[in-house]
Design a protein with these regions (language model features):
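Periplasmic peptidoglycan-binding/tethering modules of Gram-negative envelope proteins
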Residues: 1-62
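A broad, low-specificity signal for short, low-complexity segments enriched in glycine/proline
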Residues: 23-27, 64-67, 91-94
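Periplasmic OmpA-like peptidoglycan-binding domain that tethers envelope proteins to the cell wall
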Residues: 68-135
Length: 135
């Protein structure tokens, strides 16, 4: 196909996200969360404002917001928490003027850690929203 379809069905955003190939972008910075939290602090909002400007200046980019957690808690709990982190991140980007159709969310819970040690320093690195892009 030519990629011009608009998707269909209630879950089209999820399906579209899985069909697209997302890659890392050095232009979009991760944000981090406190333990068991998904609300955005001032540092996160400042980073997201810069990410939003980049996305608005590149309107053809699609971004996948990946919610991640540390290893504490059950798998199911962390998948749900990661999803809340990704959604709160998307909500903020959209409030800054990013096209909501270009922002896709997914949760990896504790499945894709950035840091593999145990302990607060490492856990802090793993409690994050990570950004991948697709044209």
């Amino acid at each position: 196909g030519n990629g011009s379809g608009s998707g269909s069905g209630m879950d089209s955003g999820i399906q579209e996200s899985r069909l697209q190939s997302f890659t890392a972008s050095s232009d979009l910075k991760d944000i981090h969360f406190k333990f068991d939290q998904y609300d955005l602090d001032d540092n996160s909002r400042a980073v997201l404002q810069k990410n939003a400007e980049y996305l608005k200046n590149n309107p053809n980019l699609h971004v996948e917001v990946q919610g991640h957690c540390d290893e504490r808690g059950t798998n199911n709990y962390n998948i749900a928490l990661g999803e809340r982190r990704a959604h709160s991140t998307k909500k903020y980007l959209v409030a800054q003027g990013v096209n909501s159709r270009n922002v896709h969310v997914i949760s990896y819970g504790e499945e894709k850690p950035f840091c593999f040690s145990s302990g607060e320093v490492c856990w802090q690195e793993n409690r994050r929203a990570h950004f991948m892009v697709s044209k």
